[in-house]
């Protein structure tokens, strides 16, 4: 096998390992303008949501034969996959709608770069919509579980599915879209997106961002002691506000930041992994 063939196979393998698709896309390129490609980003971001931490979703029967029979008869696993697929589809549509106006603006040269649209409210709306859809889907699954007597301990813990989960899937979707071939057409969108919060980012937030901002303010910012998946919206909003201020204060200095949280997440996350 010659070197060129090796390089092609290596690139195909890299693409497969990243997106879970093999030889499905011409030239191994993904486009934000293609809905099916955006769905790939949503699927990958969903795995980052860490659904394994949602109590009851894996449905461990632990010897409960009655529950096992009911779930088999009602095709619980198939229903779960279908409901989650519906949530992903709705999120995909919402993300496409968020990006679409900028595709038109770029194409028609109508001055998208000068727009002052604030995407934060749109991202909150998308995240809350996904959270509501997802929790509703989990309640439907609980209805099957609760048909069996004494099965309440097996139910999905819907009450503890917090905003932190929703922000992760939405913000990570946007992050993955930055890897797409036409990402440069949507620069203004990415500049206004928010930083995905996970354990590494919150570690940096507590160690670096809180300390830095407290040194420049009269008031004291508190460290975040909540796990990212358990964040409520108000705490999340305060963290994002502080992250944005920190990124803007430190752009073009030795921290190598741009002033845009989502873009700077690549640098910060890499530094946290490598420290």
Model-predicted regions and their roles:
Residues 1-35, 39, 139-152, 158-171, ...:
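C-terminal accessory module of base-excision DNA glycosylases/AP lyases that mediates lesion recognition
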Residues 2-160:
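Phosphate/adenylate-binding glycine loop and adjacent helical scaffold
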